[in-house]
Structures are given as structure tokens and as C-alpha cells.
Amino acid sequence: MLLLLVSVIVALALVAPAPETQEKRLQVAQAPNVVLVASDSFDGRLTFQPGSQVVKLPFINFMRARGTTFLNAYTNSPICCPSRAAMWSGLFTHLTESWNNFKGLDPNYTTWMDVMEKHGYQTQKFGKLDYSSGHHSISNRVEAWTRDVAFLLRQEGRPIINLIPDKNRRRVMDKDWQNTDKAIAWLRQVNSTKPFVLYLGLNLPHPYPSPSSGENFGSSTFHTSLYWLEKVAYDAIKIPKWLALSEMHPVDYYSSYTKNCTGKFTENEIKNIRAFYYAMCAETDAMLGEIILALHKLNLLQKTIVIYTSDHGEMAMEHRQFYKMSMYEASAHVPILMMGPGIKANLQVPSLVSLVDIYPTMLDIAGIPLPLNLSGYSLLPLSSNTSANDQAFRVHHPPWILSEFHGCNANASTYMLRTGQWKYIAYSDGTLVQPQLFDLSLDPDELTNIATEFPEITYSLDQQLRSVINYPKVSASVHRYNKEQFIMWKQSVAQNYSNYIAHLRWHQDWQKDPRKYENAIQRWLAIHSSPPTHSPLSLVHQWLTTHSSPIAVDNKKTFSSYT
């Protein structure tokens, strides 16, 4: 940079930058390197006690001891693409309209990595990104509309396990290991005289596809080797409590049914699914460890801030579900750990944070001024031991986090406000579906909905949620989007529509009576685009009592544009 400035001055070909611009570039040149490792479906509760006792995670424990662990970190949308869109944009889901796994950020959206590159950072990405639109299957483009149509179809295979009986088989998820190797190779050749930012996206511990369940039937196989399974403390695995099907919240019942989890499961099945999931987490930890070890061997560890996080968690049979797509802790709670120069060691931070905080944190690390329109806040003040920094965070960061979900496998747009001891979950327009309220200090398993017992608290939290997001308007907007997308898709496939629709993820149920389901879709398309006026609660009840086929709901949209 200095040579460039000298040549500019000597040649008089360009106007020299202002002194403050030169100062900022010099600050960036002296800034630390950053490595962000983001996995998929990692339950954040495994990064601290007591969850960390169930599986050996040596490199996460290494980061805990030498850095900061955020004890209450949450996804802003518990599904892959929208959550990653929040992380890469620093904005809530409804602000970018990243509604589902098909609809994310625009391809040319300016991410934090783009900003850091513009300010002089060397940048590189490997592995799973999944934050922009159009990268998922047709199913993900059109599946969300099923919540608005009067049928209830299983959209996933029943969760199963698959073991490689090899105590020496360490590399199970080949694609992730290959990307880890690529990241390490890049570190070996990077110019260490300039700061760099490296991103590694891992697929694990996301469940694997289940071809035995049929074409396009989701990913419901928990797959590992004996090498990793031996890292799990089997006796420490907790069998989650379930409500009876008749007692479940209607949205939870819909999710459990579409995820193919309403059948009978033995305790041994449940325990094995959870054990295999934890083993997949152990393999994830090992890849994080390879990056940390490479930084150490290259004498870069002391110059590099390492951040580990995940897009969302994994239900692993809690609340009779697997996958994510829920506001329960298993799905919504994510890991965020940081270590490196300037990061306080062995610090546990109880403040509520979320993935939108990654964007301002990355810029803050680089010394780059933060945009004023971000939904998130830098986590750097919380990683220090000085009370002044912590107080500064508390003054600016609101004492709540927002998460929202608009994708498939749930029959209502869902909004979660997490604040203090409370978790408040609202659905649809706030009237069609009853809300949920949990006191996490007394009910960490979230089994007792106390919304009707504490109406004043419920009302207060709902008003607070509405001050953050006009969720009835957002829900209506998503409802319109779902219908528009389905109509566009139906027109694009023309005469092949029936064949395509029969091979989406619900095809096994669909083929039992395709004419009935096609007629249900036609009735839905015939009505205008306003949200339905009937309650998913009544439809689920009708299905349970008559074994016919109902469900309904609506969806959402933006805060700034929809207030």
C-alpha cells in the first residue's frame, strides 16, 4: 500500500486519498486475521455444561478455554438458507425477504466479506455457503405453500441410523473433509503480510439423504462410523419427554407429522438417533480442530481470531421431531465461540445474541466502520473482561433476539421473541393460531405452554414483538409470495405439472390419492391471495378425528417496508 501511494504521488496520476482514508487502510493492515467456521445443524447447548458432557468435543473445549463462549446465541431463522442470509447480511430475515431455502439473498448482495475485501483483506470461501437464492431444489421453491392447502402429507423419511462398523474410519463426510483440506492448503500459501479472512462451511452434523425412502424424500439418515460413536457417552444421553399427540400445539403436530415422526419410536431408537447425531458433532469438531492445528503449525494462531458457529440446531427427536424448523431450543440455539488476539479467555457470556451479530463483529474486528442499518451488533465488547465494554453493549443492544420461520414443515409463519427468562412464540397473524410462552428458568425442556396462565406477560411480549416486526403483514406477504411462486412454477412446467408434483418430497402420501390433492390445490389457486380465515388448530383437529386431510395457514414479510 505504501509503494502504491509513493507511485501515485510521484506520477501525479491520481489524487492521493484523504488522510483519514490512509489511516483506516493502515488500521486494516494491522488488523488480525479472521477464520469463521460455520457448520450445519449444531445444537449450541453442546458447547457448555451440561450438554458438553454427552460427547467429546476437544477443539470446541479448546476454544472455550482460550476464548469466549456465548451461552444464549440463537439463529434468526431455523433453516439453512434464511439463517445464513441473516449471518451474511446482518439483517433480520423479513428485511431481506429470505423466506425459505429457495429464496435467500440476491446474488449481488454485499456481504461482510465483500466489505472486508474492499478494505484490503485477502478473502476466501470454501464449502457450504447457501445464503443466496435459487440453490435448492424445486421442492424447496414450492413446498411452503402446502401449509395453505387442505391436506397433510409426510414430507420427510422416518429418521433412521446407519453405522460404518470401522473403528478406524475417521473421514465419514468426505465432502466436508475435502473442503477442510482445501482451506488448510489455502492457509499454507496465503500472503501472511496482509490480513486475511477465511470462511469454511461444513454440512455436518446435518442428517444425510435417505435414498431408501424414495426419490427426493429428504435427509433423515444419521450416519457415522464406530470411530466417532465411541466419542459419545451413551449413558449420559437424555431421552426427551414428549407430549401426547392430542396435547401438542397444532403447529408442532403438523411439523411432527410432515417429518414422519408421529409413529411409534422405542426408547432405544430415540437414544440411537441422538447418539449418532452427537457422533456427527464429534466429527464436525475434528474438522474445526484441523483448522486450528493448521493455524498453530503456520504460526498464525496468535494473529488470528477464530469464530465457530452454526446456522441452526437439530431437534434430534426432542418434541417428537428431527431436523430444525422450530423455535424450540434444540433447533434455535446455536453455538458462537470466539478466540484469538483481544478475545478474553475462559469467558462465558450470558447475553442474548444471534447470527445477525456476525456481520458487525467481522467489520469491528477489521476496524471497519459499521453501517447504521444493521439488525445486529458487534460481539467484541462482550468478549472483553472490562465492564465498560459490556455496559456499552448493553446500552446499544436490545435485551431480546428475534427469530422467524417461513419455510416448509410448519403450517404457520412463526416468530420467536427471546428475552430474559421468557420465550414467546407467535404464529401467523396472531389470531388464527394460539401463541406459546415458556419460562425457560423453570421449564428448560419447553413442555408447558403458560400463555393462557399469564395473559399480561403474553400480551406485553406480543406488543414488544409487534414493535420489532409487524408480523401480521409479514405473514400476509409470505402467503402471497408462496402462491405467486407456485403459480410461476406450475406455468413453467406446463403439462408436466402432475408428473413433477407427484415426485416432490411428499410423493409417497400423494400417490395414494393424487386426484384429491390436485383438486385441493386447484381450490386453493381459485381463491384470492389473502391469508386463509380458518385456523390450523381446527384443521388438524378435523384431520385427527376424520382422517381426511386438512391444514391451513399464512405467512409474513418485512419490518421496514411493512410497518
Curated annotation (Swiss-Prot):
Secreted recorded as keyword: yes
Summary of the function given for this chain in its UniProt record: Catalyzes the hydrolysis of pseudosubstrates such as p-nitrocatechol sulfate and p-nitrophenyl sulfate. Catalyzes the hydrolysis of the 2-sulfate groups of the 2-O-sulfo-D-glucuronate residues of chondroitin sulfate, heparin and heparitin sulfate. Acts selectively on 2-sulfoglucuronate and lacks activity against 2-sulfoiduronate.
Binding site for substrate: 128, 249
PANTHER family: ARYLSULFATASE K (PTHR46615:SF1)
Signal peptide: 1-17
Cofactors required: Ca(2+)
InterPro entries with a match to the protein in the record: Alkaline_phosphatase_core_sf, ARSK, GAG-degrading_sulfatase, Sulfatase_N
Protein name as annotated: Arylsulfatase K
CDD domains to which the protein is assigned, alphabetical: ARSK
Compartment(s): Secreted; Lysosome
Cofactor: record remark: Binds 1 Ca(2+) ion per subunit.
Coiled-coil segments: none
Gene Ontology, cellular component aspect: extracellular region; lysosome
Record keyword Calcium present: yes
Keywords tagged on the record: Calcium, Glycoprotein, Hydrolase, Lysosome, Metal-binding, Secreted, Signal
Domain of life from the UniProt record: Eukaryota
Family: Belongs to the sulfatase family.
Reactions catalysed according to its record: an aryl sulfate + H2O = a phenol + sulfate + H(+); Hydrolysis of the 2-sulfate groups of the 2-O-sulfo-D-glucuronate residues of chondroitin sulfate, heparin and heparitin sulfate
EC number: 3.1.6.1, 3.1.6.18
SUPFAM superfamilies for this protein: Alkaline phosphatase-like
